[in-house]
């Protein structure tokens, strides 16, 4: 499993290549990603976050072993080779247990790391940047690094115990914004300074040495930094290369290290490519993929309303709205303003809090109903042109079947294609 270290080696040799990480647990998003990687004969990096998946089930109800089983089963069903599949764990540390005293939170984090590594996750992002109940705010670099080194030691021991070799690849550091998009309206964003990046690296190097982990330094392949990209509910802060020049140049002096950029969703294709060229060569994408899924489903729901009597319609959008209103915990603290502003945000926000609701049984039933209604007879081409114009072009040229499922998958793949192109290199 050396896809990532090989990618870094090639990047350092001047290939200007990279890899994107699919950060989603939605079956249609994962199917779209697996099929896209298969068609393009590339490895596929799929990541779970510590919020989604943990030893207690996370918000998806899946443990790391469950998630691996789910992804591998899907890959097998699509004839995707498992040796081309890389599983990563994102923001692994005490993130989920910040309300507990540090000793307790870190004990949970130890078990979190064990569960991810034992399940076969090979890319491990160690993130201990968050303060626990009895911690100072913010934590010093040294405390963050000491905790990360402790987790790295647990990871190495677990990997040796389960697989007979230690072949994990690590990412350290964190971006400044919260994972999953900013809560508030943004206008500008501070880029990580070269000094801050160096301080993080040196603190980690020192902490790893104290744990006797000098030998794993070449397997620390990336540092998470903020290159100046983010999104909120209706705006995107685009990458401005000039503001990140000093940061980009700083990593060139580290032989085995690149940067990892989070919250790259909704960047333009040109910005994605420039990020990779500037050594932000691991691009994380999640909400933009479920946003594309949501776009396709809303389009199909509009087509359904044109074709099917109201009584027989799935009512997907209304079901979704009702469930979100009845269970507001995933959006209430994120979306603000009057009733209309919040209604618009629930449906259309870039932060895509709706992604937390797709597994709901009522919504899933409405989705299945929608697909059934539109699968019974061919969708008229003018309606595909009206509501899914990019897919219409491919349907007309004969490269895409106009079935509900294929239209959804292809719409998601349009986003994946931008990331693939950005990461291809020369």
UniProtKB/Swiss-Prot annotation:
It comes from the Bacteria. Pathway: Carbohydrate metabolism; D-tagatose 6-phosphate degradation; D-glyceraldehyde 3-phosphate and glycerone phosphate from D-tagatose 6-phosphate: step 2/2. GO terms for cellular component: plasma membrane. Coiled coil: none annotated. One of its GO terms (biological process) is D-tagatose 6-phosphate catabolic process. It holds the Pfam family GatZ_KbaZ-like. InterPro entries: Aldolase_TIM (IPR013785), GatZ/KbaZ-like (IPR012062), GatZ_KbaZ_carbometab (IPR050303), TagBP_ald_KbaZ (IPR023435). HAMAP family: Tagatose_aldol_KbaZ. Component of the tagatose-1,6-bisphosphate aldolase KbaYZ that is required for full activity and stability of the Y subunit. Could have a chaperone-like function for the proper and stable folding of KbaY. When expressed alone, KbaZ does not show any aldolase activity. Forms a complex with KbaY. Belongs to the GatZ/KbaZ family. KbaZ subfamily. PANTHER family: D-TAGATOSE-1,6-BISPHOSPHATE ALDOLASE SUBUNIT KBAZ, N-ACETYLGALACTOSAMINE PERMEASE II COMPONENT-RELATED. This is D-tagatose-1,6-bisphosphate aldolase subunit KbaZ. The lineage of its organism: Bacteria, Pseudomonadati, Pseudomonadota, Gammaproteobacteria, Enterobacterales.
């Amino acid at each position: 499993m050396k896809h990532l270290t090989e990618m870094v080696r090639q990047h350092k040799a001047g290939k200007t290549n990279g890899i994107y990480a699919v950060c989603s647990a939605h079956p249609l998003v994962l199917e779209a990603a697996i099929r896209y990687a298969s068609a393009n004969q590339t490895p596929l990096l799929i990541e779970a976050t510590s919020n989604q998946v943990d030893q207690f089930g996370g918000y998806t109800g899946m443990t790391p072993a469950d998630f691996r089983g789910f992804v591998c089963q899907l890959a097998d069903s699509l004839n995707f080779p498992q040796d081309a599949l890389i599983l990563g764990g994102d923001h692994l540390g005490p993130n989920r247990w910040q309300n507990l005293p540090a000793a307790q939170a870190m004990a949970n984090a130890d078990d979190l790391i064990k569960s991810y590594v034992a399940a076969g996750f090979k890319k491990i992002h160690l993130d201990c940047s968050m303060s626990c109940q009895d911690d100072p705010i913010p934590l010093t670099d040294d405390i963050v690094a000491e905790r990360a080194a402790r987790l790295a030691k647990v990871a190495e021991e677990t990997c040796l115990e389960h697989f007979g070799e230690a072949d994990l690849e690590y990412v350290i550091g964190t971006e400044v914004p919260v994972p999953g998009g900013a809560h508030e309206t943004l206008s500008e964003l501070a880029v990580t300074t070269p000094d801050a990046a160096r301080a993080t690296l040196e603190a980690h190097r020192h902490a790893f040495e104290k744990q006797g982990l000098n030998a794993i330094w070449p397997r620390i392949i990336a540092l998470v930094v903020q290159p100046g990209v983010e999104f909120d509910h209706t705006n995107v802060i685009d990458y401005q290369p000039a503001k990140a020049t000093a940061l980009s140049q700083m990593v060139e002096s580290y032989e085995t290290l690149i940067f990892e950029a989070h919250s790259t969703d909704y960047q333009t294709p040109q910005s994605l490519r420039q990020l990779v060229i500037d050594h932000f060569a691991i691009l994380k994408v999640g909400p933009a993929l479920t946003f594309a899924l949501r776009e396709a489903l809303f389009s199909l729901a509009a087509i359904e309303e044109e074709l099917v009597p109201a009584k027989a319609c799935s009512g997907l959008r209304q079901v979704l709205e009702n469930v979100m209103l009845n269970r507001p915990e995933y959006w209430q603290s994120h979306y603000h303003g009057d009733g209309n502003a919040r209604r618009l945000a629930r449906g259309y926000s870039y932060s895509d809090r709706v992604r937390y609701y797709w597994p709901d049984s009522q919504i899933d039933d409405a989705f299945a109903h929608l697909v059934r209604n539109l699968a019974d007879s061919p969708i008229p081409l003018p309606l595909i042109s009206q509501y899914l114009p990019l897919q219409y072009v491919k349907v007309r040229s004969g490269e895409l079947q106009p079935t509900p499922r294929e239209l959804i998958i292809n719409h998601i793949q349009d986003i994946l294609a931008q990331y693939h192109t950005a990461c291809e290199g020369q």
